[in-house]
């Protein structure tokens, strides 16, 4: 009898632990979406010191990693968690959850709080992102992005670079070196938000419905893209 009760108690405790973990993972994922909204709003509020309009308006995908560094510490030892979305025929895809780790990060000592933004600029970069896991290299794969209202005419970001990376610290955006880092799907957050495992390719190609918890994030992405596009068109008419 005692053995049966012990097994039953262990089973109940295991179930409680599982539900607690699932609840915590969901809360963390929703919080990540909300913090990513703040980063996107910052992009829109600093056009002269932020990501160039033509870069943002031509990006095929946007990846936001809020609080890559907090209080001077890189969470998990050079490890951050973020959210990605890609353009589809119907607009922006539902958010896919990512983790970024390893590599050589060109961050200055003494920086306390840093957000990371990655922009996928061409089809090759898009295919890498859709693969669920890939490594960033410096040979055409990833480069520190140009900063300011307009990208320099001498840059080759439109044709050659798969992904441009930016850091945001104390409200200021800057290009960020991120060679050797590995970007992969965050399976725990994916399951927590969607209720099941879904592949990157399915989510980012527009085959997944946007969860309500991501409505604010999707709105911010759409507004940032539209603002950049309008500004670029105005500049072209001059």
Functional labels for PLM-detected ranges:
Residues 23-238:
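Small-residue-enriched, tightly packed secondary-structure blocks
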Residues 1-9:
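Bacterial N-terminal signal peptides that target proteins for export
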Residues 19-21:
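Aromatic (phenylalanine/tyrosine) cluster motif
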Residues 8-17:
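Bacterial N-terminal signal peptides
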């Amino acid at each position: 009898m005692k053995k049966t009760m012990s097994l039953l108690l262990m089973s109940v405790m295991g179930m409680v632990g599982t539900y607690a973990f699932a609840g915590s993972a969901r809360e963390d994922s929703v919080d990540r979406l909300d913090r990513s909204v703040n980063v996107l709003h910052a992009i829109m509020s600093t056009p002269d010191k932020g990501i160039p309009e033509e870069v943002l308006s031509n990006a095929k995908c946007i990846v936001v990693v809020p609080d890559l560094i907090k209080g001077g510490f890189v969470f998990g030892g050079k490890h951050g968690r973020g959210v990605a979305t890609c353009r589809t025929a119907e607009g922006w895809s539902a958010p896919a959850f990512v983790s970024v780790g390893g590599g050589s990060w060109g961050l200055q000592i003494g920086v306390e709080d840093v957000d990371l933004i990655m922009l996928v600029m061409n089809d090759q970069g898009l295919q890498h992102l859709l693969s669920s896991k890939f490594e960033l290299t410096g040979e055409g794969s990833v480069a520190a992005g140009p900063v300011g209202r307009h990208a320099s005419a001498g840059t080759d970001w439109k044709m050659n670079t798969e992904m441009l990376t930016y850091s945001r610290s104390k409200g200021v955006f800057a290009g960020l070196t991120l060679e050797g880092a590995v970007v992969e799907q965050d399976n725990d957050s994916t399951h927590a938000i969607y209720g099941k495992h879904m592949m990157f390719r399915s989510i980012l190609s527009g085959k997944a419905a946007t969860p309500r918890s991501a409505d604010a994030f999707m709105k911010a992405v759409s507004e940032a893209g539209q603002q950049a596009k309008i500004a670029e068109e105005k500049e072209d008419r001059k």
